Amino acid sequence: TLGWFDDPLLNTFIHWPTGRLAELMFHELAHQRLYIADDTAFNEAFATAVGRLGAECWLAQRGAAREREEYETDYRRREDFLRLTTATREQLVAVYASTRDAAEKRAEKWRILAELRDRHDQLKRDWGGYGGYDHWFEQDLNNAKLAGISTYHRLVPAFLALYEREGRDFPAFYRAAEVIGQLPPPEREARLRALSSVSASIAANRGGTGRE
């Protein structure tokens, strides 16, 4: 709530791995550092990027090797999950925008969601049986649920690219993010999309996520 209320620290957080808990703290603190009114996608992507970067730096300085390895494994799984859900949402958007009749759209929607579950089962096998997303898949799957994930993560690559562009210097990164945040919404979106394209190009060249 950005200081308006005493935000709870739930007891469930205490059992999180060290890196994940550090990421949560940096994420929430990022909202106090920069918040743009009426732009949830910007705010959450900025905070998510800061959470990731902050956790990396904190673990590099203070974390044990086991904690760093555990965090990287967790992060790779989350990246796999995000790629899966993003691809599924793009499929659904294409179906909704098509000229098919309502019955055909519904049938295709259920086929796509069934495929999503199957692909998650394959990911679980690739992860050695890790079931951290089982609860998410046990709930009702729909486009709104997938859109919520997109809100938090769609623009994260843009902020990671901005951090790299600013020489991995946090003060410079914050200043650059503030400048973008003050732009009119259409220009702000265009600037972030351009940065996302840079991040995608780096990832393609490295065969990874765009970060070393």
Give residue spans per PLM region.
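Acidic/His-rich structured neighborhood in mature extracellular/periplasmic domains
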Residues: 1-78, 93
